[in-house]
Amino acid sequence: MKRISLLALSLLGCLLGVGSLGAQSVDGRPSFRQGLWIGAHGGVMASRFGFTPSVRQHTHLGYLGGLQVRYDIERGASLQVEVNYQRTGWRERYDASEVSYSRDLDYLDLPILTHLYLDLGGAKVFLNAGPFVGYQLRESAQLTGKSLMGAQDKLRHELTTRYPFFWGLGGGPGISIPLGRRQRIELEGRFVYGLGNIFSTERTSAYVQSSEMRFGLTMNYLFRLR
């Protein structure tokens, strides 16, 4: 009877040992568990336009706010989808202080990003990269000193958006800090290069290029659902 009891205890010990090994990866780290995160983010976005012929500009300052969903696919890699409302545009530079012009462009954006990260024992450093698509919802302009502007400037200011769809490539680095077991806060830098134009690109058009570059800084909050 004692031998049977010892054998039963030995089998139980082996099963527990196998279970504990199943909870670890080959290198001794805890096994990876896929997770689903939801969150919100906001920040400052700056933008400039590449015009041909060129236009002297200051950096245009805008903002970004939105929601995001992140799914951890495997250790070190996730898929992230965002829905953002953001203001971009351009601000022109003139020598005369009484002359100014800026245009605001409001977009609804949908970035689809690969999220690559390195776990540093709680804190993480990461890199996001992928395509950005969006649709322009509205545009507005502010100007002073119109009578002092040249004919080319006035012509440009009369142009409205011909192509409201935005598409481009972008991403950026960031750092993620845990707030307990299910929450994280992140600081992220971002750069987006637009591949399309807002004005007509026909040969007879005033500007054959009118593409956008965006760059900025956001703060992200994420909560793990599972």
Sequence positions of predicted segments:
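Bacterial N-terminal signal peptides
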Residues: A8-G17
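Gram-negative (and chloroplast) outer-membrane scaffold detector with strong preference
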Residues: Q24-G28, F32-W37, R70-S147, R181, ...
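Extracellular loop and loop/strand-boundary signature of outer-membrane beta-barrel proteins
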Residues: G50-V55, D95-Y101, L155-T161, E202-Y207
